[in-house]
Amino acid sequence: MDPHSPGLTGGVQNQPDFQAGIADHLSHFASEVPCFVVQAMEEYTTLTGREYHPVQTVWTEDADWILLGMGSVTDDAEAVASNLRNQGKRVGVVSVKLLHPFPEADVIRALQGKKAVTVLERSGTTALTQLVNQALYRSFENHHTERHPGIPGLSELPSVSTAIFGLGGHDLQPRHLVAAFENMISARNVPLYYLGSKFFSDSTSPEMNALQEQLKKAYPETVSKALENGEN
């Protein structure tokens, strides 16, 4: 833009122009963002020596089970995964560094051939899980007919569960992530739960026990939203 000859675009738009503008934004702007993000990450690596990619993986090559998340929780997940792998558990960690546009192809390559993935969500809206599920659905479609260019086709999809944590600053302990892994490999594999929460107490009061039993009967899904936790 020439500051000596400023102009205004998009100030007044009728319906056809507005809709066309939205489509143009997706095709001519958003689709190019990943290239610039990768370029910026490469420049950052050159300057600092710290390497970043839109999707980073640890121990995923031979893993059957995946813990996937964003942000610092993946550092905790790596520490727990290291301990589990020392016990012979084939678990890996996928860390998403770019949320939008979501790097679907990279995520699919990381999840290809896995039995299950647990998405670590620090949000009750489960936005990250929805993006992972969308990528998996598109990869499944591409196995039959390529409708989504660039996304590898998968004939079998891993089961997906959501582990919500940290709401309101709720503490996250290693034992909570171990519980998430144990749930993932279990036959039940609860699809959604809250790490570290306990919705019913071990009360010695007959009145409290009776009330809790009524609540469990009225809201049975609440029982499954809390996992049994061991020691750290």
Task: Label every PLM stretch briefly.
Residues 57-61, 109-111, 152-154:
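Solvent-exposed alpha-helices and their adjacent loops that cap or buttress functional pockets
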Residues 96-104:
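Short acidic loop-to-helix transition motifs that present clustered carboxylates
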